[in-house]
């Protein structure tokens, strides 16, 4: 996922001064296992029948680039519309920003990720993320 760093994040939550995130479609390629970055993700939550989402914090392989992401897996045979929101926090409680991805019809039978902007932080500062999708709370990711 290192190639994705620098893109904006996707999230779905309270209306704050959130930046726009960036949707990236992966088809049937799992975005976590296909990445050289470290992903810390909360458990999957059901948005609708055959549609799951989870919030993640990501740290680049170089240990300095961090970002928030919301992964959506659409197992339906038709497109499904989703909007997301996520915040990225440091282990000392600092909010590094909020991102939202506008409603988009996500392709059938595939993975799509909303990424927030890459934030450069020292590798000694851990980050985690909270988020939502279509108003469903996705919980809190582990620290990475």
Q: What kind of feature is each model-predicted range?
A:
Residues 1-17:
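Secretory targeting and sorting signals
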């Amino acid at each position: 996922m290192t190639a994705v760093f620098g893109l904006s994040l996707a999230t779905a939550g309270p209306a704050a001064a959130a930046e726009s995130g960036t949707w990236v479609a992966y088809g049937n390629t799992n975005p976590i296992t296909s990445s050289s970055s470290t992903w810390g993700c909360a458990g999957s939550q059901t948005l609708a029948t055959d549609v799951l989402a989870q919030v993640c914090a990501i740290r680049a392989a170089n240990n300095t680039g961090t970002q928030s992401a919301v992964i959506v897996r659409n197992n339906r045979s038709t497109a499904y519309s989703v909007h997301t929101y996520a915040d990225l926090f440091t282990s000392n409680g600092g909010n590094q920003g909020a991102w939202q991805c506008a409603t988009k019809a996500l392709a059938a039978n595939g993975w799509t990720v909303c990424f927030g902007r890459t934030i450069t932080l020292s590798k000694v500062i851990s980050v985690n993320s909270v988020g939502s999708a279509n108003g469903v709370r996705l919980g809190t990711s582990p620290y990475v």
